Amino acid sequence: MFHVKHFDVLVIGGGHAGTEAAHAAARMGSQTGLITMSRSGIGVMSCNPAIGGLGKGHLVREIDALDGVMGRVADQAGIQFRLLNRRKGPAVQGPRAQSDRAIYHNRMLEATDQQQNLDIIVGEAVDFVMDGERVIGVVLQDDAEILAKTVILTTGTFLRGVIHIGDVSRSGGRMGDKASVRLADRIDSFGLPMGRLKTGTPPRLSSKSINWDVLEEQPGDDEPTLFSFLSKGVSARQVSCGITHTNVRTHDIIRDNITRSAMYGGHIDGVGPRYCPSIEDKIIRFADKESHQIFLEPEGLNTDAVYPNGISTSLPQDVQSEYVHSIVGLEKAIILQPGYAIEYDYVDPRALDSSLSVLSVPGLYLAGQINGTTGYEEAAAQGLVAGLNASLEARGSDPITFSRSDSYIGVMIDDLTTRGVMEPYRMFTSRAEFRLSLRADNADQRLTPIGLALGCVSDERKQAFEVKIEALDRARRLLTESSYTPKQAGEAGISVSHDGSRRTAMQLLAFPNTSFKDLSLLDPVFDGIDVETQQQMEREALYATYIERQQKDVDLLKKDEGHKIPADFDYDQLSGLSNELKSKLNSTRPTSLAQVGRIDGMTPAALTLILAKLRQSSKKRSA
């Protein structure tokens, strides 16, 4: 046994959570080690070759606002960009990019190699070095010990992972990679609440064997919406996707073989993602539907592989071949890799606090699918939070907590740590109460100041952000200081009530179908505002009234978040609480009254009782 360099932060796993965690800690100035089984596994897209989407695109923008790497790499690897929900309001529109798998991996590996304070360590983590109950390092398979002040575990689907194809099951973290079993056994010894989840992936098809001529083409947007606030344009050649559909014949084949599916054949105990069901689930759960849409997504510019989004499966290979060939355009499709389901261990995230630190195991943080989430973006956002907080702990500083009122990151962390998960968790805009102000377009305005205060933001981003804020402030002043009569507005084609009241340009901008083009008829000075700033101001004007009303709820939330709960607060002493609530509170250990209020089963009476006890305790301490 021998000892290696002592790190401030060690990260286990080089997936989306691990890379983001390692970069975040390194940007904070912590000496960081990233342990991965292989350099070729860093930044790998294990499932679909895409980043972003509804809710998920917001997370990527927020990661980028804090100078994370996912957004920039996704822009460099993007081969098709689309803004989803374009017909709806800006608050719920989500940027999405089809990615070239190889470019994404290569750019993420390059960024990781070039990141200061970050070392890549190739090896398998099999155990922790302990000092009493505290984690102080990691043991590798070759018995090498690497010591650290804090450790972040990001095992993805590798923790006791099992791959299922029909009735054939084998240990694996993903196709071609072995599972992490010894580490799983070690985690068992911590006594954490754990469970099993599953996810799945579709068969990969050969592009050359697909009849693209009979398929509907889905091109990207003419004006791509990028993820990073620093990106200037697309880097890779853009391509189209194809669209086809399952049919009655497809469904008959699947129904006739449903018991041969690993899921329906009783081989899988883990719960799968509700919003990304297998094709078997779709046929059974939506039996009245005769067709399901399939997006044929190229996996890159220099590969023959195509990802058929919509037909993930755990059926045997012969059945996969039969149902694929029943689909229009895929009659002669060659399957390059069979679809499969993967089952893995996860930790109930209620065992963590809002910093993603394990409550009962000091020095250990968890991020990604080990916390019960699904998706690259959710994993990366957790990695960012864990990386920042592990670095802060390593230097002896207080943790950073993201609020439900300031970010989707805050919404997700709060959902996980106060409510837990019964199925793989994914982000949606509907999960955010304050989504009108948590838009993808203003992620930098919400979070970059936090990043600057923490010290995790580069000088390049700081300068770009300051230039943008100055432009927004100038435009905002111009819009709020300029006012016009109803007659003037009418002459510019803006229909307002003739009530004699003057209205600011910002107020006029909030009227339906009013744009800067109309305002320029009132004063040519508005033409001098750049297009990006104009779009930002139009969104602000559109939501101004609603956000003003929403602010009251935000203030109430912040007030409740201000009621901090001591770590040693004794819920058992409160005779008015039910045993069920006492149990939930003792296991979750909420840190604020706001978190208490979001625990399942919490009543107004119980909340009042806890608040009264907090005030009583506060008076005693100050007396």
Swiss-Prot record:
Residues the entry annotates as binding NAD(+): 272-286
Molecular function GO terms recorded: flavin adenine dinucleotide binding
Top-level taxon of origin: Bacteria
Gene Ontology terms: cellular component: cytosol
Keywords on record: Cytoplasm, FAD, Flavoprotein, NAD, tRNA processing
InterPro entries, sorted: FAD/NAD-bd_sf (IPR036188), GIDA_C_N (IPR049312), MnmG (IPR004416), MnmG-rel (IPR002218), MnmG-rel_CS (IPR020595), MnmG_C (IPR026904), MnmG_C_subdom (IPR047001), MnmG_C_subdom_sf (IPR044920)
Cofactor (UniProt): FAD
Keyword flag Lipid biosynthesis: no
One annotated GO biological process: tRNA methylation
Subcellular location: Cytoplasm
Keyword Cytoplasm attached: yes
Pfam families in alphabetical order: GIDA, GIDA_C_1st, SAM_GIDA_C
Binding site for FAD: G13, G14, G15, H16, A17, G18
Free-text function comment from the UniProt entry: NAD-binding protein involved in the addition of a carboxymethylaminomethyl (cmnm) group at the wobble position (U34) of certain tRNAs, forming tRNA-cmnm(5)s(2)U34.
Family of the protein in this entry: Belongs to the MnmG family.
Assembly mode: Homodimer. Heterotetramer of two MnmE and two MnmG subunits.
Protein name: tRNA uridine 5-carboxymethylaminomethyl modification enzyme MnmG
Gene transcribed to yield this protein: mnmG
